[in-house]
Amino acid sequence: TGDYSQVYKQSLAFVLGIFMIIGILLIDYNFLGKYYKAMYIISLVLLAIILIPGIGAERGGARSWLNLGPLDFQTSELVKLTFILSYAKIVESRKDKLNTIKDIIPVVIYAIPFLGLLFAQPDLGTAIVFACIIAGMLFTAGLDINLIKRVIMVVLVSLPIIYMFMAPHQKGRIEAFLNPEDPTLKGNYQVMQSMIAIGSGGTTGKGLYNGSQSQEDFLPVQESDFIFAVIGEELGSVGMAFVIGLYALFLTRMLYIARQAKDFYGT
């Protein structure tokens, strides 16, 4: 489309990501674990600072972005890493005491401030991601399966109450999810355009920069949340299968590394 601003931002983010990967490879995770309390506090500060007017930027109904000049930074993305590093240490200290509600309450209390700050933004999507991270870590730590079932039941029963406190745009997204074929719902426009893009790509796609949905801006937020639809339109099912394969390889490698960890914290 002639707009290279996203190319610049994505390239800058890519370079920063490479430096972070190199840094992580050079630092022993046990060294980071020694500073889990500091990381815990820093994580909360990063989520809280964007709630201050004039510092945090609002997008899509949520104040979750920090403007750093040429690069907009979503603090929750960094917090995902620092939270895992700090929370893993907390879970490790109680890994043999996760069999009853009484045992799990102290561990959950550590996570509540994070979920509270995310709801305050309000960023329901990221809050759900954090909830899944917490659940996954507790499950890995040996949380009793019957206790997991009870927690799921409590969450399901609480859904109507949670819905009452949701922001209007969040309710709109849920309504769109429950009624995906209703074109009158604003939240369905992007999903429908992405389905058109993927469907029109066929097996091999229309070719790079030849997608009508993406190049003519029918598909919003195509550079981030809906990049997969662009891949489907321009590279077809072959391109999508390749991307899914990369994710599968990445996940397999992650699980292998976790199983090879020398201690519970590394897992």
Where are these regions (language model features)?
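Hydrophobic alpha-helical transmembrane segments of multi-pass inner membrane proteins, especially
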Residues: G2-Q190, A229-T267
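Long extracytoplasmic/lumenal interhelical loops at the membrane interface
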Residues: T203-L235, A258-A261, Y265
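Extracytosolic (periplasmic/ER-lumenal) interhelical loops and adjacent juxtamembrane/interface segments
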Residues: Q190-Y209
